[in-house]
UniProtKB/Swiss-Prot annotation:
Binds 1 zinc ion. Keywords: Cytoplasm, Endonuclease, Hydrolase, Metal-binding, Nuclease, Ribosome biogenesis, rRNA processing, Zinc. NCBIfam families: rRNA maturation RNase YbeY. This is Endoribonuclease YbeY. GO terms for cellular component: cytoplasm.
Length: 164
């Protein structure tokens, strides 16, 4: 079972995005065939909070669209509490809207990408080098396709960081 705890630190009603995340992440959860329950939190944040989190914990000054903080657990810890706590994901709808316009994506694809991308980071996947990037982005594409979403990355992260 997948349990998602939601928090909303914005002035926007996020109920439709919660339903969307539930659908997408349930498919992602089933894709991995976990033999234990998973719990994670998603907090919707505004630009200011997204930038503060990114500055404080990542030492980057740009406004992030998604930031993830995984929790590492041993098999014994998972068995002891009966589920695996994945960690916390912070999603910035305002930045997602800007990126959807900038890269000509529809907002559902952009948000679907952010939910899956953040989920994979919580599972320990990363894109710090080309080999890891290929693994993570291939998984991301497969899960998005299972959700009937297509997301084409039209920039590389270094270019994005330099422009912000």
């Amino acid at each position: 079972m997948l349990k998602i705890n939601y928090f909303n630190d914005t002035d926007v009603n996020m109920n439709s995005w919660k339903k969307f995340a539930n659908k997408i992440l349930k498919i992602a959860y089933n894709y991995f065939n976990f033999n234990y329950d998973i719990e994670l939190s998603i907090t919707f944040v505004d630009d200011l909070k997204a930038q503060q989190i990114n500055q404080q914990y990542r030492n980057h000054s740009y406004i992030a669209d998604v930031t993830s903080f995984p929790v590492e657990m041993t098999e014994n810890e998972i068995k002891a509490i009966g589920f695996r706590e994945l960690g916390d994901m912070f999603i910035n709808l305002s930045e997602a809207k800007r990126k959807a316009i900038k890269y000509n994506h529809d907002l559902n694809s952009e948000m679907g990408f952010l939910f899956v991308h953040g989920f994979l980071h919580l599972l320990g996947y990363d894109h710090e080098n080309l080999d890891d990037e290929k693994i993570m982005f291939d998984l991301q594409d497969q899960i998005l396709k299972l959700n009937n979403l297509v997301y084409i990355i039209k920039f590389n992260e270094e270019d994005y960081l330099e422009s912000n």
